[in-house]
Amino acid sequence: CLSFAVCSPRRHGKQYQGFGVRFTCVSGAYLVVSAVRRADATSASAVRVAPGATFASMSDRGYRRPRPLSPLREHLRDTFWFAPTTGFVCVFVLWLIATELDDAIVALLRREEAYDELSQLIAFSQDAKTIVTTISSAMMTFIGVVFSISLVAVQMASGQLTPRVVRIFVRSRISKLTLTVFLATFLFSLLVLSSYESETDPRLVVSVPLVQSLLILVLLGLSLLLFVVYVSATLRLMQVGPVVDKIARDSFRVLGRLPRGPGGEDDPGPETARVTHEGRAGVLRDVNTARLVRAARRQDVVLRLIPRIGDFVVPGTPVLAVHGGSVPPRHRLRSSVSVSVERTLHQDLAFGLRQLTDIALRALSTSVNDPTTAVQCLDRIVQFLAAVARLPLGTVHHRDRAGRVRLVQDGPGWDDLVDLAFEEIRWCVAGSPQVTRRLMAGLDDLLLLAPEDRKKSLLRHRELLVQTVERNVAVAADREFALLPDRQGIG
């Protein structure tokens, strides 16, 4: 979806390429758009845009489909062993290279008979040996203490917010980089210690670990720097604001990958067959839409995805319905649908709201009783719903190069997102005027932004909230106070 389509006179004649289309500035007020030839792009076309105009949406014939997730890549991102193992291999190769350099330096000095310089190098390496020994003995203790504290912090965050924040920690690049550098420093220090010789005579010594000693000092400095960054990132994970902000940013990233365009305009025809799920049971995490579109085009059929992204599927249940012909060959459908043990935000538009709602519900529970956290979650929920209020939602039609619908994918509609955002929270807010006031303000703001055909669900939740407060709050003045819209709750 393009935002602006205006070019200045000084850019006249320049071409730009992106989003699968090429833009040519032909005057200060008009822009010619021509499609770039791609496997999933439409035929070339040109569009003239009036001055100051914006693209509200683009047809789903030419959008860039989200790249499918690689099961191996996702498995490696969800584990903690791959990065340290890679670090071990890299640091071992680095040690071999440093050893060769040290041997070459000693051999060069002996050929030049520079025994005074060689004696100075031996003295430096002996002084550095004390530092290397200290590093090797203290590094594992340091690693254990740091990550023990970190795991306690993550446990506290998951208990106060939601268990889903553990996934944020596991997939954090800074966490894996810190662990990798710490362990690599420890391993490298052991390798350097094995390179020291007991011989100190410059005429007899074979190797002096000069480069190795310098590298271990560099790794030590990098470890200290990453320790500061890692502690800062872990402390942010314990705060509500940064966690909620990251969930919101990830949700908007998913929203940016969604196709834009009208749906439901082409009738797929009667259902002729179904394809069942034959893999392991799990949550539908990812759909390779490009592969399914190609398979449907070659078979000249229309495929319809039965479960939504985020649904739990078990072997033997139908995942695809075929319209207008026979089932495509199995090898063409292989790896087109991926499942996982839990939901992800890659293609799941509703999962961000699910996480925000979970945090709000945990905050409103009697064991936590933190309405301010619930208000922070409602801030992001209203922000997200305001962003999608005028966007096309629900069923998505994926088309081939000829513009024919080949894959129909059901997604959450406006009413589904509104119910997910407010239904459960509304059941728990009767005793918290701070949250009811923020909820009323959020609903009123969305009523101003939503089109007429989407106001019904908002009005329903607003009326149900009023009924909930009137039913649970006996004093009229308290009811009036609890239903007064306030974007800060009570401030």
Question: Model segments located where?
Answer:
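Membrane-anchoring hydrophobic segments
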Residues: 54-136
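Short basic (Lys/Arg) and small-residue
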Residues: 60-70, 74-78, 204-205, 229-304, ...
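Membrane-interface segments at loop-to-transmembrane junctions
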Residues: 69-85, 119-137, 162-183, 203-215, ...
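Transmembrane alpha-helix detector for multi-pass membrane proteins
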Residues: 90, 94-106, 122-199, 224-231, ...
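Short, positively charged and aromatic/hydrophobic N-terminal segments
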Residues: 3, 29-30, 40, 47-49, ...
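Hydrophobic alpha-helical transmembrane segments and immediately flanking/interface helices
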Residues: 152-164, 200-219, 292-295, 303
